[in-house]
């Protein structure tokens, strides 16, 4: 009578299905979500913004500016635009384009069409920076505001605000 062998599947006989730890560590290092990234304070965000502004002004003493504001659908943006425009005029900056106004309310900055157009203008070197009344034109959440600053700085642009981050 022939002998049949029954193979039993156990943890000891299973083929390893885990990637080695170095692969996991590599992937995790790339995927640091904002929720576990330490939040920067308003003062730290102000320092980041001002460093970018100083760097850009040293390269271009009379930069070309795009004016930006975000308001609720029923709000008039005139006051916010006037304050941002006044900031640009006081500093002798050039107003290169029509103001960009998003009537989206406090949505994530990456979803706003007029802000995207200004970022594209930075990419195409049509403007050197963005002027706004306050950081709340971008976000009142530090993580979203930091992301917006990073997007602007990655394009060698700057953000100039009429009020400081600690004034929100």
Predicted regions and their residues:
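Short, structured surface patches at the beginning of a domain
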Residues: 1-168
């Amino acid at each position: 009578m022939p002998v049949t062998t029954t193979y039993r599947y156990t943890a000891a006989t299973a083929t390893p299905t885990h990637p080695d730890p170095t692969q996991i560590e590599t992937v995790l290092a790339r995927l640091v979500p904002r929720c576990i990234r330490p939040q920067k304070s308003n003062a730290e965000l102000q320092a980041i913004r001002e460093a970018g502004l100083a760097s850009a002004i040293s390269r271009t003493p009379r930069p070309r500016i795009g004016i930006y504001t975000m308001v609720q659908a029923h709000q008039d943006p005139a006051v916010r635009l006037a304050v941002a425009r006044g900031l640009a005029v006081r500093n002798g900056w050039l107003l290169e384009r029509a103001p960009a106004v998003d009537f989206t309310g406090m949505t994530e900055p990456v979803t706003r069409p007029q802000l995207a157009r200004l970022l594209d203008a930075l990419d195409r070197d049509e403007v050197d920076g963005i002027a706004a009344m306050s950081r709340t034109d971008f976000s009142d959440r530090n993580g979203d505001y930091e992301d917006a600053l990073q997007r602007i700085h990655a394009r060698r642009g700057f953000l100039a605000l009429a009020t400081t981050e600690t004034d929100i």
